UniProtKB/Swiss-Prot annotation:
The lineage of its organism: Eukaryota, Metazoa, Ecdysozoa, Arthropoda, Chelicerata. Its main location: secreted. Expressed by the venom gland. One of its GO terms (cellular component) is extracellular region. The keyword Aminoacyl-tRNA synthetase does not apply. The keyword Cytoplasm does not apply. This is Cryptide TyPep-18. It comes from the Eukaryota. It is found in: Secreted. Causes weak hemolysis. Does not cause mast cell degranulation, LDH release, and does not have antimicrobial activity. Does not cause edema and pain. Keywords: Cytolysis, Secreted. One of its GO terms (biological process) is killing of cells of another organism.
């Protein structure tokens, strides 16, 4: 999961 994945 990427930090930009909301």
């Amino acid at each position: 999961i990427l930090p930009n994945d909301k």
